[in-house]
Structures are given as structure tokens and as C-alpha cells.
Amino acid sequence: MAVNGTAADLRVAGRGPTIWLAGSPDELREWMPLGIAGIVTNTVVLNQYAKPYGSVIKLIEAYLEITDKPVVMEIDGHSVEELLEVGKVFTEMSDQIILKIPCSVNGLKAFAALKTEGVETFCTTVFSLTQAAAVAQAGVDHILPFCEPVKEVGGDPTRLIRECAQMFGDRQQRPLIMAALVRTVETAHAAFRDGCDELVTMWTVYR
């Protein structure tokens, strides 16, 4: 999916910060028609939700059946080559699929390679402003600062969102800031207040 495609256009064309959901296909079916921007997965929930479907591929097919919105697929690998190979398997399934890759040296290299191909990407496990700056320069389109894990160790869950919003400002080519691991309505409120462009949460919090 091209960088200037569906997901990247949502912030400009939409009515405010976009809301993305996590959950199983059956859990999300009810909520997707209510203006939800897309579905976001991670490796933990993929393994959990895939069991009833028999495989991750079958699970992704089930997500694609319930929505025509983007489905963000987290991938992992021990090398840049493995990340690109795994990513290709999923992006060839549907134009709706967008890749999410953890922040790492291999991730930086994968983002740069995918940028040259016009493939839209999300960067997860972002815990510092310097990481956000580095992956932005590598070409990532969506940066996911983690909120609740910071709160659990006594920190400000949305500080990094504020810092990213200030750093990127109104730069035309800046990545979108997605508040991630948002487990309470209070944290969602703070993330919107502090400038996130997007937010992903479980359907139970959205409800």
C-alpha cells in the first residue's frame, strides 16, 4: 500500500484523530462500521487469536472479510531479509494489509527498503524521541509510542506523544503519531489531548 494511500490520507481527510481497534474478527465486526479507521494486530494477539482459525493466514483472511479498511500486520524476523520476505507474504494477500515492524536496527533497514518500494509501514515499540526521529528519517509512516507500559513503571504515559507532536510539528512529510497500548479511557483522553494523530485500543475500551 502506497505511503500516500488510504491510511496516510485518513488524518487529512478525516474528522479528527483516527481510532483503530484490536481484537478478534468476531469481536470487531460490530464496531468497524462506526468510523473505525482500521485493525491493528501484534504478534502476541496474532498467536492467541489464530488458534480457532488454524493459522495466522486464516486469521488475517477473517479480518479482511469483516472490513474494507486497513489491517495492520505485525511481523518480526532475525534479519532484514527475513523481515522483507515475511512482509511480502502478507502484503501480497491484499492491498489492505500494512506492515508493522518493531523498532530496531534491522527495522530501520527494512523501513528504508520498503520506503523505496512505496510500502506503507508502522513502527512499534517506540520508547524515546531519538528512536522516533531515527525511524522517521528511515521512512516510516506511522510511529507507535507505547503508553500504558510507561504508566505501569510510574511514568507519564503520553509524554512521548507530546514530544513527538512538538518535534514533527507541521512538517509535510512527517509520520503520523499513533498512541499504542492504550488500555483505559483516561489514557485515551490524555493521548488525544497531547496531540496523537491516531490511537489504537482494544474494542472493550472503545465500547
Q: What do these predicted ranges mean?
A:
Residues 38-39, 43-48, 125, 142-153, ...:
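Glycine-rich phosphate-binding active-site loops on the catalytic face of alpha/beta enzymes
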Residues 26-34, 82-86, 110, 128-138, ...:
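Catalytic cores of alpha/beta
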Residues 2-3, 15, 22-117, 147:
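Active-site beta->alpha loop and helix N-cap motifs at the rims of alpha/beta catalytic domains
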Residues 24, 168-207:
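C-terminal alpha-helical cap/extension of soluble enzyme domains
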Residues 20-25, 77-81, 101-105, 123-130, ...:
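Glycine-rich beta-to-alpha transition loops that act as phosphate-gripper elements at the mouths
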Residues 13, 64-65, 115, 136, ...:
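Anion (oxyanion) recognition and catalysis
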Residues 126-160, 164:
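Histidine/lysine/aspartate-rich catalytic loop segments that bind and position anionic ligands
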Residues 2-10:
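Short, charged N-terminal beta->alpha structural module
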